[in-house]
Amino acid sequence: MYYIGVDLGTSAVKLLLMEGSGKICNIVSKEYPLFFPHPGWSEQNPEDWFTQSMEGIKELTEGIDRKEVAGIGFGGQMHGLVTLDKDDNPFTLSDLLPGSPGSVHAHPWDISFP
């Protein structure tokens, strides 16, 4: 029996395959780009998260019977808004914190509420 851990970070998705005993069998990391459209802003394409996660899982599980994977857990960076269209597809890049358009609006609140 195997378990998969997936960490969607701001620079890469990191994946771990382990046995039920806790023995680590494989570790994979798949990078994706980070965009800086304006000073202080950072964005990523949610499609890159998905594509690299799927590629990473394929690579991670090479050589095992995938039917033996009993569970998968996901974790990721916080505060990344993904906006979807009517068909549930991302239609913009995801703004990341720190450094996003929202930080311009949040600054006055920081001053008003110490």
Description of each model-found segment:
Residues 98-114:
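Glycine-rich phosphate-binding loop plus the immediately following alpha-helix
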